[in-house]
Amino acid sequence: MTGTVSTAVGCAVGIPVGVGVIVACLFWIRMQRRLKEEDIIDQELNRAVYDESGFVSFNNIDTLKAEPNGHPSSEDTNEVMHSSDIDDNGDDDDEDHNARRNNTYAAQDKNNGKYVPAYRRQINKHNSILQQQRKSRNLVNTMGHSIESLSMDDHSQANGKSRQVSVYDQMVPVLDDANRDSSSPFPTNDKDTSDKKSNLFQSHDVSANTSTSFFETRSNDNLIKNLNSHDFGSYYPRRPSTSNLNHSQGSLHTRNSSMLSLGKIENAENVFATPKSENILKHPHPLEHESSSISNETNNVTDNTIDGESASKSSKTYQLKNNYDIQNTSEIAEEDQYENEFTNYSENKRAYIDGLRPKM
């Protein structure tokens, strides 16, 4: 029984563990194969990038220029191909080697696994034909360009240990000049180019100076307009007003930050304050300023009412009717500005409450 139990436990535990290990090993082997394939693809990509044999050579940009007569004929092509096998000068070895390499590149790609598009093969073929045709027509230009290419090759070989130069490093944009002759690919006269550059810099400096002076004048004009249009501190009336608004006494001190309006606040009358008997007597209602005689009579009446108790009855000036004595201003902090003889809320409330009481 003991052996049977141990066998059953071992099978129940060992079989799933073994299956898991086998599956993990299979996945690991598959991942390693995928990584190896990716490494091979990366190596081929690097070789394709840094191998200039499969791309257009940008050392001689004249080779990309199309001839005015169009593509060369087949007879000229055959003659050029035949003449390319003969080395007339030792300086043309590099170009001959490049031409033969470009001619045989399309044939070699059939055996290689790397795919080359049709347009790339056509460009390489056309490039080799143009190089050979240009060499056969003008040996002097060919020698000059070969010297330049040799110097660039020597320079690349000298720096090859530090950094490997790719064909994409040679892709320098060339901008067309509108002033040059259309027949020549580049301006041949150095003096003309220097004169053009100097004229360009001079015009740039003149335009910069003009623009800066223009912006300075515009900024000064805008500053003057803003200063003239701004209203510095003229928020309060220049002469006292007779209108009574519902503002507290501290509303005049809300603009203490305005330095220009401080002088006006000290001298100006607080027109928003609670009307008192003295102010009312000094400033009667505007309706009674119809004539000078009425104003004189009002002043005389107010002078007489200050001494007697019948000042409010004899005076015809308009006064606010409050819930308290208007003379007792020291004990009362606030009042209702809209409470007058027609809207006496406290009196109306008192009358309403008295009306609710039972009559005896």
Curated annotation (Swiss-Prot):
Compartments where located: Cell membrane; Bud membrane
Composition bias type Acidic residues, residue spans: 86-96
Ranges per topology, Cytoplasmic: 30-360
Topology feature Extracellular, residues: 1-8
UniProt membrane topology term: Single-pass type III membrane protein
Keyword Hydrolase recorded: no
Gene Ontology BP terms: cell wall organization
Major site of localization recorded for this protein: membrane
Residue ranges crossing the lipid bilayer per the database entry: 9-29
Residue stretches of biased makeup (Basic and acidic residues): 189-198
Gene Ontology CC terms: cellular bud membrane
Composition-biased stretches (Polar residues): 101-110, 292-316
UniProtKB keywords: Cell membrane, Cell wall biogenesis/degradation, Membrane, Signal-anchor, Transmembrane, Transmembrane helix
Region of interest: Disordered: 63-114, 176-204, 284-316
Function: Plays a role in cell wall integrity. Affects the cell wall polymer composition in the growing region of the cell.
Family: Belongs to the SKG1 family.
Record-given protein name: Suppressor of lethality of KEX2 GAS1 double null mutant protein 1
Phylogenetic lineage: Eukaryota, Fungi, Dikarya, Ascomycota, Saccharomycotina
